[in-house]
Amino acid sequence: MYKRQGDSNATLPPFNLGDFVMQQIIDHTNKIALALNTVGLINIQFAIKDDTVFIIEANPRASRTVPFISKAYKQPYVNYATKIMLGKNKVDDFKFDPKLDGFAIKQPVFSFSKFPNVDKSLGPEMKSTGESILFIDDLKDDDFYEIYSRRKMYLTK
């Protein structure tokens, strides 16, 4: 079953992607952004199977994930992108060194109680009406296990 990206959880930093997979993501991102002459933000969706990274799609725009990343890393990435798009700065003018003590988890917020007759099953159409962010110190946190066990996620680390 396909689940809409906006209705899913995200964890920063990634907790179950090895260096080889992360390097593929970085390499693909750089190649796509350069090939598209991207100025500003780009949204790229990847799928990973057996340590191979596949590209689903790339869009020259921001996504709902950008505010989450900015808040998690305490960096104004939208401001950086805006200044770059306006020609006031170049990418090299900003330091991109995301550091995080612990982990940040993005969780979708659903308002099904306000819409009792709506189909609650998740699929390709986005159904979340917002997001929340949870900061935890480590992956042994009870909230982390509660969130991911509900979704039957495979926890490798």
Enumerate the language-model features and the residues they cover.
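ATP-dependent carboxylate activation and anion-phosphoryl transfer catalytic cores
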Residues: 3-157
